[in-house]
Swiss-Prot record:
It is an enzyme of class 2 (transferase). The gene is ndk. Signal peptide: none annotated. It comes from Pyrococcus furiosus (strain ATCC 43587 / DSM 3638 / JCM 8422 / Vc1). Gene3D superfamilies: Nucleoside diphosphate kinase-like domain. Its EC number is 2.7.4.6. This is Nucleoside diphosphate kinase.
Length: 161
């Protein structure tokens, strides 16, 4: 079965100010994933609290809100087969010190004493992805299009994208 999914990715403020946007996007595209929605925004407190509502009341909540609202972010809708799982694996463990080399967080995340800068958010489930995408994107901001190589990977040679 062709499990094409969509997931939300946020390139966080630390990655934006360190000039890592292109590198991170490139990794997803090289993996064969498709960016079907993308924009740069500055997340305000209200949106941050909606996004991270499941963490409200936890000791790290305020630091998380401060972190995600500190500078602009790039939000993306990424599409592909098993996109949620694939993107999570590419992102690596939440804590950069636990993230394997070769993952985005393993290569670019920083653990600075009492703060971690893990450069990227990736939805943790299909349900979370749907909820998170709807927070950042209107339906008309997500695009259907064919990549140049899509025809090559189709099961039938004459299949159209």
């Amino acid at each position: 079965m062709n499990e094409v999914e969509r997931t939300l990715v946020i390139i966080k403020p630390d990655a934006v100010v360190r000039g890592l946007i292109g590198e991170i996007i490139s990794r997803f595209e090289k993996k064969g994933l498709k960016i079907v929605g993308m924009k740069m925004i500055w997340i305000d407190r209200e949106l941050a609290e909606k996004h991270y509502e499941e963490h409200k009341g936890k000791p790290f909540f305020e630091a998380l809100i401060d972190y995600i609202t500190k500078a602009p972010v790039v939000v993306m809708v990424v599409e592909g087969r098993y996109a949620v799982e694939v993107v999570r694996k590419m992102a690596g463990a939440t804590d950069p010190k636990d993230a394997a080399p070769g993952t985005i967080r393993g290569d670019y995340g920083l653990d600075i004493g009492d703060a971690i800068y893990n450069v990227i958010h990736a939805s943790d489930s299909k349900e979370s992805a749907e909820r998170e995408i709807s927070l950042y994107f209107k339906p008309e901001e997500i695009y259907e299009y064919c990549k140049a190589a899509d025809w090559f990977y189709r099961e039938k040679k004459q299949a159209k994208c």
